[in-house]
């Protein structure tokens, strides 16, 4: 099945483009946002960044961003990562194996 994806030369850019076209990109983003909010990750990250600013009011944006980015990526729950990867895989496989055409799949 994975060979089919590569044999059709589906580049990352093409996959993202097709995910946008099908609406799956927005759906995946919304689901990720919901899951991160539901598990308290967004609140945890907000509190973390506020704590940094409160302890060092002279911190520049770039340092705050780098610190927050590292903490953010490390603290995403594994269950959220696995669910997202599963959903992405399903979408990519759907793109690689489109449903038969409206003519009932008859090949000429």
Curated annotation (Swiss-Prot):
One of its GO terms (cellular component) is P-body. The keyword Transcription regulation applies. The keyword Transcription regulation applies. One of its GO terms (biological process) is protein transport. Keywords: Activator, Chromatin regulator, Cytoplasm, mRNA transport, Nucleus, Protein transport, Transcription, Transcription regulation, Translocation, Transport. It comes from the Eukaryota. Involved in mRNA export coupled transcription activation by association with both the TREX-2 and the SAGA complexes. SAGA acts as a general cofactor required for essentially all RNA polymerase II transcription. At the promoters, SAGA is required for transcription pre-initiation complex (PIC) recruitment. Belongs to the ENY2 family. PANTHER family: ENHANCER OF YELLOW 2 TRANSCRIPTION FACTOR (PTHR12514). This is SAGA complex subunit Sus1.
